[in-house]
């Protein structure tokens, strides 16, 4: 969670400066990576806090028929100046910062909500770690249970 991330950031600062304690503030994030990492972390946190995460749906086309057979859901972040940030810029860092689960849960909720309003098939990219995460696993299970039988 964001609270754990902030606590870890303060703890890293405390250890690096060999002080008795540290109180979190956004400038402490600078110690945990270079300026680019710092900038991306700020954008991830801002996107989570301000609902600036969104899904795009990439068509999957059957090579024989040249028709769309389903869509793949892909996460994006609306960054500074409304620029779109692709996962290659933030997913690895989000895992290191304990923010990844927020992004995964967003995508699961987003895609299941989309499935309720459309007849198209949509895939979600999840890893074995996502499946093994109890909270994520429970979310997927609960969403599937609530999904009408014909939409599963």
Kindly give the residue locations of the regions a language model identified.
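Catalytic core of bacterial c-di-GMP phosphodiesterases, primarily the EAL and HD-GYP domains
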Residues: 1, 67-71, 97-152
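Catalytic strand-loop-helix junctions within cyclic-nucleotide turnover domains
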Residues: 1-3, 18, 27-33, 60-65, ...
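Generic recognition of well-ordered alpha-helical segments
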Residues: 5, 9, 39-42, 109, ...
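Catalytic/regulatory signature loops of cyclic-dinucleotide turnover enzymes
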Residues: 5-26, 42-54, 81
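Conserved long alpha-helical elements within nucleotide-processing catalytic cores of c-di-GMP signaling
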Residues: 8, 88-92, 101
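Signal-transmission/dimerization alpha-helices at domain junctions
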Residues: 13, 93-97
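Nucleotide second-messenger and two-component phosphorelay signaling modules
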Residues: 16-18, 46-50, 62-64, 80, ...
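Active-site core of bacterial EAL-family cyclic-dinucleotide phosphodiesterase domains
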Residues: 35-93, 125
